[in-house]
Amino acid sequence: MAGNFWQSSHYLQWILDKQDLLKERQKDLKFLSEEEYWKLQIFFTNVIQALGEHLKLRQQVIATATVYFKRFYARYSLKSIDPVLMAPTCVFLASKVEEFGVVSNTRLISAATSVLKTRFSYAFPKEFPYRMNHILECEFYLLELMDCCLIVYHPYRPLLQYVQDMGQEDMLLPLAWRIVNDTYRTDLCLLYPPFMIALACLHVACVVQQKDARQWFAELSVDMEKILEIIRVILKLYEQWKNFDERKEMASILSKMPKPKPPPNSDGEQGTNGSQSSGYSQS
């Protein structure tokens, strides 16, 4: 792993400009409102989380998979490759990169089938339609898009250091850690360095736990305006999440989501590959 975030591909290539991100997203916002797009982000992050938990992966592996997923759709429309295929592909790749060990083909397909059937049947009434050849092809497109820049830095390590420095590990760490997990349901991992996200999550945890840490934050040599920007995104997430009924809303949102054509079928593999290739070639 690159030892210095500031010299890493994560910082040099994958901290994106917000306006560029929104510009790329306009193709999808012809079909979805901004709020519906947010809800899709929350939903597919939940799918990746459920897949990772089913496979008993560490949280860092799940977080890396989520970042890969977001990186792909930061550059390409949802219709380029079906997110239902991209989600397990990201889990498959992240498990290798994070040295968790390769998830076997059988386990991966079994997990995706089981999770969609038991946890998300309200959104996906049909069986998981993909097989390992689709996952491997999708992985190729994902690797090409990311230019093989696979090392991802996360807020977990800096968060642990900050909480220890503050001397409030037992009081603040569990809540701040959960808030970090929740930030992966937003664009924050594409827009800000992980240490800033860690500080913002710690700030929110301090407010919730009524811990006065103003002096500690005042002594940091960090742009507090950016920390406040991140906090606003976190608060917006919780506000939207509170009013989001996945079971009632997702089937309708997914029906509006732009999709690759034609969908895969038992003898239409060429069509699937063609749709992914043509979608991938759009810039």
Curated annotation (Swiss-Prot):
GO terms for cellular component: mediator complex; nucleus. SMART domains: CYCLIN. SUPFAM superfamilies: Cyclin-like (SSF47954). One of its GO terms (biological process) is positive regulation of transcription by RNA polymerase II. GO terms for molecular function: cyclin-dependent protein serine/threonine kinase regulator activity. The keyword Nucleus applies. The gene is ccnc. This is Cyclin-C.
